[in-house]
Amino acid sequence: MEAKAVLRNTPTSPRKMRLVAGLVRGKQVNQAKAILLNSTKAASKNVMLTLKSAVSNYTLNNPDERVSDQELFVKAIFVDGGMTLKRTLPAPMGRAYRIRKRSNHLTIVVDKVKNPVIN
């Protein structure tokens, strides 16, 4: 049984967040945490928080099951565009440039590995 966690309106552009999401897609949770801890991207902190929340949701939804991070994997992770704040920047000759401050919605789904390989 899978569990899901959603982080909404994160003040990071979706393009930057998708770079980090691609690093952990399909990985086991313990591997994904190690990758995110060593990543230099600012978005990796938000992905780590959402991943921990998804694992916690899995344990709460399945109280009779005891699972470790090795037994769970990132089944799906996707980033959607959130709301865009529109701001103006004064430009030469009385004009104004538009600045778009983008945000995103991050969704992570974790599930149990069918045949776990334990080292």
From Swiss-Prot:
Q: What is this protein called?
A: Large ribosomal subunit protein uL22
Please indicate if the UniProt record lists RNA-binding as a keyword: yes
* InterPro entries per record: Ribosomal_uL22 (IPR001063), Ribosomal_uL22_bac/chlpt-type (IPR005727), Ribosomal_uL22_bac/org-type (IPR047867), Ribosomal_uL22_sf (IPR036394)
What the protein does? This protein binds specifically to 23S rRNA; its binding is stimulated by other ribosomal proteins, e.g. L4, L17, and L20. It is important during the early stages of 50S assembly. It makes multiple contacts with different domains of the 23S rRNA in the assembled 50S subunit and ribosome.
- UniProt KW keywords: Ribonucleoprotein, Ribosomal protein, RNA-binding, rRNA-binding
The gene that this protein is the product of is rplV
Q: Which GO terms describe its molecular function?
A: rRNA binding; structural constituent of ribosome
Recorded GO cellular component terms are:
cytosolic large ribosomal subunit
Protein species of origin: Chlorobium chlorochromatii (strain CaD3)
Provide the GO biological process annotations: translation
On subunit structure and binding partners, the annotation says:
Part of the 50S ribosomal subunit.
Top-rank taxon, per record: Bacteria
Q: Indicate the family of this protein.
A: Belongs to the universal ribosomal protein uL22 family.
A Pfam family this chain is assigned to? Ribosomal_L22
